[in-house]
């Protein structure tokens, strides 16, 4: 039977090139053929849809294989991969993918001359919304055709009958890739025929010449196929932005829902900034009327307050092409190109992170061109964009990834406007994941536990579930601060950790309007959310066999909450009327290694020929440490790539062990390691100070150039200490006297590496000490080599960081006050005054070519930054200690770097292995007692394996920077 199946499948695949008159998907399940001048689409031999287009010409010739392979910064899936077969049918270009079709008509005099229409027979179950220029409405289920004007997307269920069917095939109709000179379209129905009609309020294309239509898109398959499809972005133009490193999805506190005029009140804005700071939300949205702020305050004051709290502000604008008279402002600041450039440049200088632009007026060509102008200008000034009162997504989120969300939805704002939303919200919420949200990000503004002008009757767990079910790169949390801060600690932590960009999305169960259960993965953590769209109790099906067992937390319906930690993943979950749940499954921290047995995991990475500096792109934001990484299995290779970049451009190559002969012995309590290369020998000596408590083998803390942490932290702990004497490898004191390279012990072994920076050589030296500990073993050294820590302060803090980053046998790295060139991001230091920056550091430590190539504004060509140096430590533990009293240390830049680096640990569900503590009021390298608890927590957990109740992952004595 299996062989017959394989034979049939092979025949279907062959038919893609051999069967005349029929277009076939790569997997053979989807076909398109011409009958009576109409294109008939079938899925697994079942007719799904008919459409007419262009001249109805026959499908001829061999197809061309089309591949879409790209990465999204936000969306339902990070890495998108799709293949299709492209056919030419006269003026029609037809693509048949495994999950749908896309077609466009070329050589049109204007878009009004397109002749595309779909046939939707009576009896077909359909979820379809009447068109409005803001795309705010419900998707009621119907089976009868009705003349009118309808909005995208349209969801259909076949076979053509009015009953639900387990074998049903679904089709979702929409469009993609609106470019300049085009308008968006909608559907006009006359009986069973739904014509594609561009917005009739404009010329809709060139009056003369030849134009092509946008892609007409039909996603086809099971409900899961429809929900999980990326076809809308697959056919869109690729990203046009050279530098996307500054684009950061995230959660947002939002003033408007509870206070419609709150953005003209500085004190109310402060409440929402404080909420964002408390919950660690990266953004706050200051909405309409900020240009009318009273009390002697201005938007500059509000932005400054947000930045001082470490919160990035977004601000609102009226597009001034839709609702103008009587509408809120600011108005008329973006319409003209020169005004737009001036306004967005002002936003960038002030520290605004993005803009929400509202009140457009439909899908006309002028509006589409205006939207593209706004996106391109915003990108030039590093501004995120949220379109409101505007069209629905049509692929721009791939082409212009600074467009992180779009309204185009009947969302929670309508609790302010109409009483009917209260009774219809639950069913509507259970419809949106199958309709509107399929095609792109949706700014519904979810998670309202309290009431606005009109009450909500959904449960708290239902509201929490919407934050996962509704995909949006900027997820605006609409409720008032006191509502969120009165929730259980578990709920507040959930909101603090909530991702807004997903690696993977799966539909688990559901049916439009009745219920939906969806699972989204971020790194190694799964977020499973479900809601009941009905007014009756309902048990939702949760078959989660694809999720590995892990630490689970379930937020379910209660009064108002039931929060539990299930030992096994539930197969069903009972929900109250209009109820819901969220299940968070984190891979057990023990499932990811705390430390490795080897210096560098061998993943087969081979360094390429690195580009010349002049050929490197300019990146103002911090590069993406997780570029090309979908899950933890890919992280080792990415670590190798980052490490190779840092060595090539920054510190020089750390020699591999291949050509070295290493031997070790104990001389009393002193470890002696001899390293011989080509007849030259370098000797390392370090005395092991054993603890007075506990039994061997002991964990060990290695101090770079000494132990800077207070002695009392180790007195009562079974931890040995030893010192890496860096002068045995590269004598910094001699460099400070003579400023000569190539005159150090290391250079006798490796004379061809005399241009290396000292941090490469010191990292090599500490690794050889660890070699000695491993070679002799715990029976001789009394040291447990699975629990090695490294620490240092100031220049030795940098040394500790490089040593920990470049040797994966180090379980815990504590870098104390490392300053510029350590954890601080070079790019951020460049924007600060009187700090240790790339051109103002000690070049004994780095390659001289780094200063020559990347000083000044050339720092923006650096292909990495030091948040990635920090990230090399992941999945092992890292603690950064700062002191803001010493400006030279550039702790503002370190804080920016730390926050960006922690995203790597967070992606893999182990964010508690990385933290920072920046506290003043003490001397340089003199750890105050107020920081003992953080340091002790890390030592106890990662060197001693103890459970700790206290953990502060992100404490800083100032918040005066913008990431």
Predicted stretch roles:
Residues 579-580, 588, 596-685, 690-696, ...:
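Alpha/beta-hydrolase-fold serine-hydrolase catalytic core, especially in secreted/extracellular enzymes
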Residues 287-459, 793:
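Aromatic- and carboxylate-enriched substrate-binding clefts and catalytic-loop regions
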Residues 321, 703-779, 785, 819-828:
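Cap/lid segment of the alpha/beta-hydrolase catalytic domain
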Residues 768-834:
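Primarily recognizes the serine-hydrolase "nucleophile elbow" in alpha/beta-hydrolase
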Residues 22-234, 562:
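N-terminal accessory beta-strand-rich subdomains and adjacent acidic, glycine-rich linkers
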Residues 565-597:
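C-terminal beta-strand-rich structural cap/linker in extracellular carbohydrate-active enzymes
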Residues 511-547, 581-584, 679:
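Carbohydrate-binding surface patches
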């Amino acid at each position: 039977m299996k062989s017959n199946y394989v034979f049939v499948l092979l025949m279907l695949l062959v038919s893609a090139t051999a069967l005349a008159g029929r277009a076939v998907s790569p997997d053979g399940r989807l076909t398109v053929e011409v009958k009576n001048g109409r294109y008939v689409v079938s899925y697994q031999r079942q007719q799904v849809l008919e459409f007419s287009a262009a001249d109805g010409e026959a499908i001829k010739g061999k197809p061309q294989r089309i591949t879409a392979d790209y990465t999204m910064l936000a969306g339902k899936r990070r890495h998108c991969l799709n293949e299709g077969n492209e056919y030419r049918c006269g003026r029609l270009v037809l693509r048949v993918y495994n999950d749908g079709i896309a077609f466009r008509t070329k050589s049109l005099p204007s878009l009004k001359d397109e002749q595309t229409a779909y046939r939707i027979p009576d009896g077909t179950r359909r979820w379809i919304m009447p068109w409005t220029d803001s795309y705010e409405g419900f998707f009621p289920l119907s089976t009868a055709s009705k003349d009118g004007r309808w909005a995208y997307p349209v969801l259909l269920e076949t076979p053509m009958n009015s009953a639900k069917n387990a074998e049903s095939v679904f089709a979702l109709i929409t469009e993609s890739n609106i470019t300049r000179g085009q308008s968006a379209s909608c559907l006009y129905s006359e009986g069973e025929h739904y014509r594609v009609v561009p917005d009739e309020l404009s010329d809709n294309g060139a009056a003369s010449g030849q134009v092509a239509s946008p892609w007409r898109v039909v996603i086809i398959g099971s409900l899961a196929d429809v929900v999980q499809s990326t076809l809308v972005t697959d056919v869109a133009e690729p990203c046009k932005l050279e530098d996307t490193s500054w684009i950061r999805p995230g959660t947002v506190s939002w003033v408007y829902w509870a206070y419609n005029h709150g953005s003209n009140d500085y004190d109310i804005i402060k409440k929402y900034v404080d909420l964002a700071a408390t919950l660690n939300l990266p953004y706050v949205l200051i909405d309409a009327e900020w240009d009318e702020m009273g009390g002697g305050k201005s938007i500059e004051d509000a932005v400054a307050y947000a930045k001082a709290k470490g919160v990035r502000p977004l601000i609102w604008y009226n597009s001034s092409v839709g609702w103008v008279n009587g509408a809120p402002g600011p108005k008329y600041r973006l319409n003209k190109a020169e005004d737009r450039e001036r306004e967005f440049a002002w936003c960038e200088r002030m520290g605004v992170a993005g803009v929400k632009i509202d009140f457009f007026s439909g899908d006309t060509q002028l509006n589409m061109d205006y939207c593209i102008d706004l996106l391109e200008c915003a990108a030039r000034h590093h501004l995120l964009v949220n379109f409101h009162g505007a069209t629905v997504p049509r692929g721009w989120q791939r082409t212009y990834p600074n467009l992180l969300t779009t309204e185009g939805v009947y969302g929670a704002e309508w609790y302010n406007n109409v009483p009917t939303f209260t009774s219809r919200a639950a069913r509507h919420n259970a419809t949106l994941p199958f309709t509107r949200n399929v095609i792109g990000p949706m700014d519904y503004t979810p998670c309202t536990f309290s009431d606005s002008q009109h009450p909500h009757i959904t449960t708290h767990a239902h509201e929490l579930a919407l934050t996962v079910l509704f995909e949006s790169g900027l997820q605006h949390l609409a409720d008032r601060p006191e509502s969120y801060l009165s929730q259980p600690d578990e709920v507040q932590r959930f909101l603090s950790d909530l991702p807004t960009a997903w690696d993977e999305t799966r539909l688990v169960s559901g049916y439009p309007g009745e219920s939906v259960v969806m699972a989204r993965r971020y790194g190694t953590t799964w977020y499973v959310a479900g809601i009941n769209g009905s007014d009756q109790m309902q048990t939702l099906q949760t078959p989660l066999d694809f999720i590995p067992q892990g630490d689970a937390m379930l937020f379910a319906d209660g009064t108002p909450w039931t929060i539990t930690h299930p030992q096994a993943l539930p197969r069903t979950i009972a929900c109250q009327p209009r109820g819901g749940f969220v299940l968070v499954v984190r891979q057990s921290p023990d499932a990811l290694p705390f430390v490795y047995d080897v210096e560098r995991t061998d993943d087969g990475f081979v360094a390429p020929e690195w580009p010349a500096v002049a050929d490197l792109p300019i990146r103002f934001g911090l590069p993406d440490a997780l570029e090309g990484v979908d899950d933890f299995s890919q992280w080792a290779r990415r670590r190798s790539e980052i490490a190779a970049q840092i060595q090539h451009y920054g510190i020089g190559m750390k020699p591999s062990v291949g050509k070295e002969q290493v031997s070790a012995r104990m001389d009393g309590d002193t470890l002696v390691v001899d390293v011989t290369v080509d007849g030259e020998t370098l000797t390392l000596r370090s005395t092991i100070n054993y603890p007075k408590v506990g039994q061997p083998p002991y964990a060990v803390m290695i101090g770079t150039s000494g132990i800077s942490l207070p002695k009392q932290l180790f007195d009562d702990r079974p931890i040995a200490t030893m010192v890496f004497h860096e002068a045995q490898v590269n004598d910094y004191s001699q460099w400070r006297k003579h400023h000569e390279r190539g005159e150090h012990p290391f250079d006798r072994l490796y004379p061809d590496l005399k241009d290396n920076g000292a941090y490469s050589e010191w990292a090599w030296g500490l690794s050889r000490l660890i070699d000695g500990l491993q070679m002799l073993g715990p029976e001789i050294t009394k040291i447990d080599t699975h629990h090695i820590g490294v620490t240092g302060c100031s220049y030795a803090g940098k040394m500790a960081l490089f040593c920990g980053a470049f040797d994966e046998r180090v379980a815990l790295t504590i870098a104390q006050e490392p300053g510029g060139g350590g954890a601080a991001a070079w790019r951020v230091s460049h924007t600060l005054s009187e700090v240790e920056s790339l051109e103002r550091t000690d070049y004994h430590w780095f390659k001289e070519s780094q200063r020559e190539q990347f000083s000044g504004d050339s720092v923006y060509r650096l292909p990495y930054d030091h948040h990635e140096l920090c990230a090399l430590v992941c999945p092992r533990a890292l603690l950064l200690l700062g002191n803001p009293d010493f400006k030279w240390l550039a702790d503002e830049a370190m804080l920016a770097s730390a926050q960006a680096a922690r995203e790597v640990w967070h992606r893999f569900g182990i964010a508690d292995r990385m933290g920072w503590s920046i506290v003043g009021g003490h001397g340089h390298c003199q750890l105050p007692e107020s920081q003992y608890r953080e340091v002790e927590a890390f030592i106890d957990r990662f060197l001693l394996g103890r459970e700790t109740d206290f953990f502060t992952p992100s404490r800083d004595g100032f918040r005066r920077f913008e990431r």
